C-alpha cells in the first residue's frame, strides 16, 4: 500500500472515530447543524444554530441513526456556545486531544448535518487571540483552519489526525476568512460554567466609555499611564452610579490594574468578579480618587 493510501485510510479512520460522538442538531428552521457529545446525556453545539423560538422542538440525530428530543441546559451567545440535554443518556463522550493544536498540522472538521458523518480536511493556519467576538465575548485563544465549512458544519468538532477533538468549529463568531474553532480547553471551562448557571455571568459596572489620551497632569496622577477610559454615561441604579462614579471621570485602574480601553476593562470583569468589591481609580478635577464598586452581572 502506498504512503498516500495509508494516509487516506488513517484520516478516514479519524473521521469514523469522531463520528461516534458527533450528532445532528435540528434546532432551527432550515438545515440541521452538528453537535459534540460532552457526556452520556449532554451535547455541545453552536449557540447561533439554536433558535430560541424552537427550544421546545429540538431534535437530535444520534450516531446509531435514531432520533431523540433535546432540551437547552444553557447558552452563551458571547462565545457562541450552547449545551443541550437528551433523556436517553446513550452518547459516547468526545475524546480530547492530548497535545495542543499546532500551526501547520493537518486537522479535520467532522459534522453530521444528515444521517452520516461529513468531513473536511485542512491545515491549522494559526492559533490566535485574545480577541473580542461580535457578540461581546472575549476569547483568549481561537484556532484557524483552512478547511471548507459546508452547511450544517457549525457545532461539530475539529479533530486531529487521530480523531481526537481539538475544538468546536463555528461560523457564528463573525471573524470571516478561515474556519474558526474554539479550543477544547476553553470550551470545557465555559461548558462547566453553563452547566452550573445556565449562562456565563459577566461583570458589569454600568458605564458608557471611550478611550482618551491622558493630559500631562492626569498621566502623572495615574503613575505614568498614557491612556484611560472617559466615562460618558452612567446607568441609573447601576454599580458605578451606586459607587459615585460621575460622567466626565476618567477611569485609569481597577484593583491596581491599568485600564486603557474597553477590552482592558472587560478582561478584569470576568465571571469570578461578579458580586465582588473592586477598587476603581479615577481622575476627577485634577485629583486621583479611589472608589469602591461592587461588580454587577450583565444579563
What do these predicted regions represent?
Residues 19-21, 82, 86-94, 118-177, ...:
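Active-site region of chymotrypsin-like
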Residues 32-33, 153-155, 229-231, 246-247, ...:
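Short loop/turn microsegments at loop-to-beta-strand junctions
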Amino acid at each position: 500500500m502506498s504512503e498516500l493510501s495509508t494516509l487516506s485510510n488513517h484520516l478516514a479512520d479519524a473521521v469514523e472515530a469522531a463520528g461516534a460522538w458527533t450528532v445532528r442538531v435540528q434546532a432551527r428552521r432550515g438545515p440541521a447543524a452538528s453537535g459534540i457529545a460532552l457526556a452520556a446525556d449532554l451535547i455541545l453545539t453552536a449557540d447561533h444554530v439554536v433558535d430560541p423560538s424552537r427550544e421546545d422542538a429540538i431534535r437530535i440525530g444520534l450516531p446509531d441513526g435514531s432520533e431523540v428530543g433535546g432540551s437547552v441546559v444553557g447558552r452563551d451567545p458571547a462565545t457562541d456556545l450552547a449545551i443541550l440535554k437528551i433523556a436517553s443518556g446513550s452518547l459516547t463522550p468526545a475524546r480530547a486531544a492530548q497535545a495542543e493544536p499546532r500551526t501547520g498540522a493537518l486537522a479535520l472538521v467532522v459534522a453530521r448535518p444528515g444521517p452520516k458523518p461529513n468531513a473536511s480536511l485542512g491545515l491549522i493556519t494559526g492559533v490566535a487571540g485574545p480577541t473580542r467576538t461580535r457578540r461581546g465575548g472575549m476569547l483568549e485563544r481561537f484556532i484557524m483552519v483552512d478547511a471548507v465549512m459546508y452547511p450544517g458544519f457549525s457545532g461539530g468538532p475539529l479533530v486531529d489526525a487521530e480523531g481526537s477533538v481539538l475544538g468546536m468549529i463555528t461560523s457564528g463568531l463573525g471573524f470571516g476568512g478561515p474556519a474558526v474553532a474554539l479550543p477544547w480547553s476553553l470550551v470545557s471551562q465555559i461548558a462547566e460554567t453553563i452547566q452550573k448557571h445556565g449562562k456565563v455571568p459577566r461583570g458589569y459596572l454600568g458605564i458608557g466609555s471611550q478611550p482618551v489620551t491622558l493630559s500631562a497632569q492626569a498621566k502623572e496622577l495615574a503613575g505614568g499611564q498614557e491612556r484611560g477610559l472617559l466615562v460618558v454615561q452612567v446607568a441609573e441604579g447601576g454599580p458605578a452610579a451606586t459607587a459615585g462614579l460621575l460622567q466626565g471621570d476618567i477611569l485609569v485602574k481597577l484593583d491596581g490594574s491599568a485600564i486603557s480601553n474597553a477590552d482592558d476593562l472587560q478582561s478584569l470583569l470576568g465571571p469570578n468578579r461578579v458580586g465582588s468589591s473592586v477598587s476603581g481609580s479615577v481622575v476627577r478635577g485634577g485629583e486621583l480618587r479611589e472608589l469602591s464598586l461592587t461588580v454587577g452581572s450583565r444579563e
